Each structure stands twice: as C-alpha cells, then as structure tokens.
From Swiss-Prot:
Gene3D superfamilies in UniProt: P-loop containing nucleotide triphosphate hydrolases
Record-given protein name: Guanine nucleotide-binding protein-like 3-like protein
Residue segments, region Disordered: 1-41
Presence of keyword Signal: no
Keywords: GTP-binding, Nucleotide-binding, Nucleus, Ribosome biogenesis
PANTHER family to which the protein is assigned, alphabetical: GTP-BINDING PROTEIN-RELATED, GUANINE NUCLEOTIDE-BINDING PROTEIN-LIKE 3 HOMOLOG
Family statement: Belongs to the MMR1/HSR1 GTP-binding protein family.
C-alpha cells in the first residue's frame, strides 16, 4: 500500500497576505487620484454665473466688509500693543518736565486731544498748557470759541505767538506731546526762537483715540483698512459740490460714488478691483485738504463729522 500524499494548504503565508493588502491599498489610492483628476477636468459652471448682477454685487460687498473688519481688528490689536509703550513715554516726559505742553490741531481740537495723557499730567500735579496749532487755517471767531471752551477745565490754552510763549521761562524744563502731524517740533522751534535758545525738552508722539473725518483730512490715518467711502460721503454732503467739480474738471455729482467714478475717469485710474480704484480716487480728492487748498474746521459742540469748508484760490 502506497503512502498517501499530503494535500497542499490553501492558506497564504503572512508575507503574501500583507503584500496583497499593500498592493490593494496602493491601487485604491491610485484610483482615488484618478477620480479627482477626472473630476477636475469636468467643466463646472462657476457660482458667479448662477447669481444675478445684484447678488454678485452684494456678495462682493460682503467680502469687502469682512476684509475691512479683519483689518480693523488687526489695527486695534496693534494699537493696544503700542498703547502701553506711549503711556510709558508720557510718564517719563512728565517726570522730567516742569511744564507740559499738549499740541492741539485748531481745526478740530476735540479729536486731537489725548485724555489719558492729560489725566497723567493732572495726577502728577504738573502744569498743562494747550497750544493751538494751524490757527491760520481757521476763522478767528472759531479759534476764540475753542480757547474759551478748552480753558473751562482750568488749563491754559494759547497760540504759537511771541506774547503767549513769553510765559515759558528759559530755565523751564518742557515736555511736549501731541498726535502725529500736530506740529510738535514746529512749536518747539517757535519756543526756541522766542526764548533765543533751545530749552531743555522732551517730545512724545501719542496716537489718536479713534478715526474721525478730520483725522483723515489731516492725514493722520491712511485709507487702507477703513470704510473710506463713508467719510467721502460725509464730505460730499457738506461741501460746495459745484466748486469741487470745477477744481477737478469733472461733471456735477450728487454722491460720493459719482464723484469717485468721475475722478477715476479724468485721471485714468484703472484696476481690477473697484474698491482699489475708489481708494486711489479718494486719495487724489483728499490732496487738496492736505495742501490747504480746501480748508476745514469744526465748531465747538458740533458733531465730529459736522465740518465747515472753505476754498482757497
């Protein structure tokens, strides 16, 4: 009787089984990649084609406002980080000064003041003198109104004149603070000229508390990251639109959008984004305010956007 041959097992070895699973996974990945490539090649209708023009404009405005909100948040975050640094500078200024001068823009004194810095000066018992700068661009009666208003808290309020500056003695240590562009160094040079020598002084720049129409017209804030069209609209509502049309050589307009469109056409401002075009047109429009070709000022107790305007020849 012969020996019965043993049947070969159908079980796979571990090595073969793992190899088959590995090849299966690789084939599955390859299939998914091919499916994605084929899907990408399929022509799809963009969502913008399915929307009406009005819906597209609304969608673009939503995106623009979301971008502005993010930029405003980033700016607020940066300002909060800078706040402690400038307050430290004010503390050093107060400690080294006998008299503290706050340089204020006469065109809008309220928005150019810094209440936190003023409070530090008061708490340290130092004398605060408010100096109104740019008074030559404001009607005399408006300057006088502001001087009376600012003196109500017991502080001195003067102008950059020889008679007013004489009260600052040569031996006095002076601390000067104010917003960017307020004219701090101009005031210091005026004091040096009147006293016939440069006084012992410390100068600190303090940020504005918020964005206002006058701070934009004074060049303290750029247009990037703010709702600049709202401020242009506020100007259009209050200014002589006929005079603006003559100065820029543009047709008559009734609102900010028509003004900016006309400036874009006249100066050949073109860009893929309408918002960028309008920002460039706004910067061109604001040049006359920065160069003092269009004067502006705010009266006591007026709203922060309620400015008066006058045109220079």
């Amino acid at each position: 009787m012969g020996i019965k041959k043993k049947r070969q097992s159908k079980r796979l070895t571990t090595r073969k089984r793992e190899g088959m699973l590995k090849r299966a996974r690789a084939n599955e990945r390859k299939k998914r990649r091919m499916d994605r490539k084929m899907q990408a090649k399929v022509e799809r209708i963009p969502p913008s084609v399915l929307r009406t023009d009005e819906e597209n404009m609304q969608y673009a405005e939503i995106k623009r406002m979301a971008k502005l909100r993010k930029m405003e948040y980033d700016e607020a975050l940066r300002n909060s980080e800078k706040k402690e640094a400038y307050l430290d500078g004010i503390l050093r200024l107060v400690s080294k000064s006998d008299v503290v001068i706050e340089v204020i823009d006469a065109r809008d004194p309220d928005s150019s003041r810094n209440s936190e810095a003023e409070k530090i000066v008061s708490e340290h018992g130092k004398k605060l003198i408010m100096v109104l700068n740019y008074t030559q661009y404001v009607p005399r009666e408006v300057v006088d109104e502001w001087k009376v208003h600012l003196k109500r808290d017991g502080n001195d309020c003067i102008e950059v004149t020889e008679e007013d500056m004489r009260q600052i003695g040569k031996e006095t240590r002076i601390g000067i603070f104010g917003n960017p562009g307020s004219g701090k160094n101009f005031v210091l040079r005026g004091i040096s000229r009147i006293l016939e020598e440069k006084p012992n002084s410390v100068v600190v720049s303090v940020p504005l508390s918020k964005v206002t129409l006058s701070s934009i017209l004074r060049g303290c804030h750029g247009l990037m990251g703010i709702a600049f069209r709202d401020y242009i609209e506020a100007i259009v509502k209050r200014i002589d639109r006929g005079e603006v049309s003559l100065r820029h050589g543009i047709p008559e307009f009734s609102n900010a959008e028509e003004l900016l469109e006309s400036i874009c056409d006249v100066h050949g401002i073109r860009d893929e984004s309408r918002s960028v075009c309008y920002m460039k047109a706004s910067e061109r429009f604001l040049e006359d305010f920065l160069r003092h070709k269009i004067l502006f000022w705010r009266r006591v107790y007026s709203d922060e956007n309620d400015l008066s305007f006058a045109f220079c020849q």
